[in-house]
Structure formats: C-alpha cells, structure tokens
Amino acid sequence: MTDSESPTPKKSIPARFPKWLRQKLPLGRVFAQTDNTIKNKGLPTVCEEASCPNRTHCWSRHTATYLALGDACTRRCGFCDIDFTRNPLPPDPEEGAKIAESAKALGLKHIVITMVSRDDLEDGGASALVHIIETLHTELPTATIEVLASDFEGNIAALHHLLDTHIAIYNHNVETVERLTPFVRHKATYRRSLMMLENAAKYLPNLMTKSGIMVGLGEQESEVKQTLKDLADHGVKIVTIGQYLRPSRRHIPVKSYVSPETFDYYRSVGESLGLFIYAGPFVRSSFNADSVFEAMRQRETSTSSLLPNKD
C-alpha cells in the first residue's frame, strides 16, 4: 500500500448504535466492592484505562483484568484509549504483590494480566511481567494465570522467558485483518504477531494460545476468514471476535456495526478450522476469560461448553 492510498474505503460513520449494542448497566454492591478493592491498591486495570464497555458487567461478577507495567503505553494505536507516553515510569517492583493482594480479596481463581507496550525497556517489559507472575504463583498457587502480552518487538528470548513461568493461557492479539494493521496498530505488524503466536505454540505445544480481532473497522468478510485461517495455521487455539467501539472522537471511526448473525457466521467459520471461537458484539480479549478458559479446558477433555451468553 502506498502512502497515497487509503487503508479503508470512505464510508459514512454509522449515526446510532443498533439495538443489539444497547445493554443495561449492572451496577450494585458487588460492582462497588470490586471498584474499591482495585482502587485501594492503586492498580490500573484495562477495564478503566481502555474504557472497556464491559467494565460494569465484569466488576459486578468480581472479575477484572489487571494492567501491568504502568497506565501509559509507548505506542499510540488508533483504537485504544490507554494514555501514550514517550517516557514511562520504571516498573513497580511491588506490582506483583499488589495484584496478588487484590486478587485474593476478589477471590479470583483465574487471573488475567495484560500490559502496556514498553518499547523503552530492553526486553519489552518481559522480566517485570515474569516477576509479577512468579509472585502470583507464590501467593495464589491454585490460581490459573492468563497473560495478554505485547509483541516485545519480536524478541523471542523475551517471549520464552515469559512462557517459562507456566502460564495457563498466552494471549497476543492481531487486533484486525492484515490490510488494516498499519492503520489500526502503531509500530506493530500483522506478520510479527503471527510469528510470536506460532513460536509460542511450538515452544509449548500444550499451551493454550489465544488471539483476538475487532470487526467494524472496514474489513471485508473474506479478510476476516483469511485472518482466522492465518491464526489457525500459526498454532492459535482460541480466538475472540468483538465489535470495535470508538472510545472518543480522536480515535478511528467505526465503519460498520456487525450483526449478531455475522458473528455467528464467523464463529462457524472458525470452528470449521478447529478454532475455539468466542464471538459477539461485546466480546473482548479478556471478557468472561474465566469461562472461556473452563470451556476450552473441558473441550480438550471432550465435554460440553460452559460459555455464558455471549451478548
């Protein structure tokens, strides 16, 4: 694609949310308890920092996704609401202990850690992330841990250092189809993400590898199908597919609102490729991650799915 070419066709931005994107906000006592538990530890969560539309749902279930290595990112992706910085603070050596204390208070059995990209650090922050995970293993030995990691700028040694911690799920999102990647993701490449996923799958063949994409960014149906095939071909086992929702006017506009029927179709396409697909308008990488983990684990032992309603 040349500099003069537009990465997406020019289309009018949808004026209103369709009915399937309207939901009740389940606020209440449990939500308030989760909010207080997290904020009392001074911990950032991707739920808040990325303005996730599912925050009230997840916090009302006593679940949250912790954001490691700070609350500001060294990349400025066009879809993401996390703050950008060129000079982030050093990693907090007590972060693992703070997360462990919070996870204990919430009674978490499946802990999800995501991270900001730390291109300022030699290993992309892998060592700091490993320290957090090792602390969690010590403090909550029966809990399973899922990590949504950056691409570490393609640093395979950093990836292996992370995988040696025996996490339950390694998650790295391709985010969108290959054609739109330069427009959607800052400093990341589609092929490098596939390379990291494939390397993880080969390094630990029994590891649950996971990735996710957003739709509604201007992608074509054929491109989504190709992305699912690419992920399957590179060793991914679990894929989440959700509707892109614009956090603010300074972010990439929504090109289309994808119907629930289309999500069902994408799920059937992915399942035909052997993938475990969790798809729906509000699905995000870590949305209902505990249930997805249990459903995947049971699928691997040939039992029925326990997934909650995807909407």
From Swiss-Prot:
[4Fe-4S] cluster 1 binds at residues 47, 52, 58, 286. Binds 2 [4Fe-4S] clusters per subunit. One cluster is coordinated with 3 cysteines and an exchangeable S-adenosyl-L-methionine. It catalyses: [[Fe-S] cluster scaffold protein carrying a second [4Fe-4S](2+) cluster] + N(6)-octanoyl-L-lysyl-[protein] + 2 oxidized [2Fe-2S]-[ferredoxin] + 2 S-adenosyl-L-methionine + 4 H(+) = [[Fe-S] cluster scaffold protein] + N(6)-[(R)-dihydrolipoyl]-L-lysyl-[protein] + 4 Fe(3+) + 2 hydrogen sulfide + 2 5'-deoxyadenosine + 2 L-methionine + 2 reduced [2Fe-2S]-[ferredoxin]. Residues 59-276 form the Radical SAM core domain. Its EC number is 2.8.1.8. Keywords: 4Fe-4S, Cytoplasm, Iron, Iron-sulfur, Metal-binding, S-adenosyl-L-methionine, Transferase. HAMAP family: Lipoyl_synth (MF_00206). This is Lipoyl synthase. It comes from Chlamydia trachomatis serovar L2 (strain ATCC VR-902B / DSM 19102 / 434/Bu).
